């Protein structure tokens, strides 16, 4: 089951790829101020969202497709946790823009999961 894997023409891949680039930039800022532990966790979860969405494009079945997006959904939740932790900690860069973009991605991913489940039954 192969679908559109082009970042330029697949909206969810574009959203998650651009978000991953912004997460990398944010984490580099954290690294410069010595906040390595949070940076490492956030970098892993924040870039994994798009990696799993990309993997879903070559899923072996509809069930596998749904599963990959469920993993993306879990990574979204983890990323949200780390960003909110930064938001409420002292001397961390602002996370509001990232949290807003993450909410947009979360809505898209949840819609993909819901519609795929509906069409799968």
Where are these regions (language model features)?
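Short, C-terminally biased terminal segments at protein or domain edges
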Residues: 1-51, 55-121
